[in-house]
Amino acid sequence: MSADAPRADADVAVDAVTAGPTEPSEPAPTTEPRAGWWDRVRGWPWWVHVLLVWAASRLFVAGAFVWTATVQEANVWTGANPSYQEFVGLFYDAGWYRQVAESGYPAELPRDEQGLVQQNPWAFFPLFPMLVRAIMTLTGGTWVVLAPTVALLLSAAAVLVVHEAVRHGAPRAVAARPGLPLATVALVCAFPTAAVLQVAYTESAALLLVAASLLLLVRRRYGWAALVVVALGFTRAVALPMAAVVVVHAGVRWWRSRRGEDTFGRRDAAGLVGLAAAAGISGVAWPAICGWVTGVPDGYLQTQEAWRGVREVVPFSGWTYVPAFWFGEWGTPVMVAGFALTAAVMLVPAAWRLGPELHTWSAAYVVYILAVIEPGSSLARFLLLAFPLAAVTAGVVPRPAWARRVWFGAVLVLMLGLQVLWVRQMWQFNPQGDWPP
């Protein structure tokens, strides 16, 4: 060691003493960036995100309704240029639901001179109008005000449950894309016929109950699921395909238990048998009640025939003549292309990434409505309840991230445009004759 080293250390010490106290140094600038407004928004609870998407979509649709009402002619429900509440509370099937709420169901089916059953309220299920009637009784409010408001609030609850149904029912897809539940909600809200979620129709209640049934089934709350399915059976004629979902769920649980990946005891089996029975009974309960009250065992089917171009209800029969009515010689190619597109959506990898319950519901429900309806102007509205297909659509392009965003944005813009077109073309009523939305 150099002899100068101790001296150098001493010099440093002396300098430090003679220099006096040092001035406090300025705090070092933080290197952590402040959170921007978008980061703060992303940190909000999931349900706030869902309700923001829902609120924005409902305001958008309300604007489309208000715009369309300005060109609405006088009609059987209102005068020209109806108010927003009249426009969404009285037109088309809303008028029938109002009749149910205010007058109930007839004890005798109306018939024409040939004895054929005419259009009547028995075609419209009771849960939604009776709920509104109860609120009318409690508050003294009118149908025009309360029915669209109840539907709007039910739609808010529905999208919250849709989010959770996707989160719990498609774990593999959500693990790969955590934003999938919210993307699903956005596409459901933007679906071309989602405007009905704020009119006096049953779509809001039905969407809530379908999503709740699937969520409870996935979470294995079979008793609660049975109660919800019973309510669904008195909301829309869509409880029967839920039985197929229950069977698939039971089969998957049994198979996994055989492989040691799950448990499946007698209590589980009994709960699922009861749930399947509830779905089956709920699917026929309202037609049975109609037959019992009117004294006509097939009164519900005869009532449905009154809305069809051909007076018969035979599974899939409508597809033999309706496409030609709408598209002429192009009817068959259009029908085949539509079926092919539907099958493709069910079979793409994004569909298989859904859980078995969501995947089965989409397939069973679509097959069911294709079997029982006469394909027409209401078909697109019925597809709204196949909400897991929105998750499939959002997940078609998984990566890269920029391509996924471009795809989602393009689909969203297209759907919103079609939504405005649907309101303008389908909800606006032509007094000289029109098709129901």
Please provide the spans of the model-predicted regions.
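Short hydrophobic/aromatic helix or loop-helix immediately within or flanking a transmembrane segment
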Residues: Y92-P110, Q114-G140, V314-G318
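Transmembrane-helix motifs of polytopic, lipid-linked glycan transferases
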Residues: A134, L146-P171, A344-P349
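Membrane-interface transmembrane helices that cradle and orient dolichyl/undecaprenyl
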Residues: A175, S213-W224, V397
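Loop-to-helix entry region of an early transmembrane alpha helix in multi-pass inner-membrane enzymes
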Residues: L116-W122, P126, M130, L138-L160, ...
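Multi-pass, polyprenyl lipid-linked donor-dependent membrane glycosyltransferases
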Residues: V150-L153, H168, A183-L215, W224, ...
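Membrane-lumen/periplasm interface segments of specific transmembrane helices
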Residues: S57-E73, A243-T342, M346-P349, G355-S362, ...
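Transmembrane-helix signature of polytopic, membrane-embedded enzymes
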Residues: T142-V145, V162-A190, L208, T360
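Signature aromatic-anchored transmembrane alpha helix within multi-pass, membrane-resident enzymes
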Residues: A276-G280, R399-Q428, P436
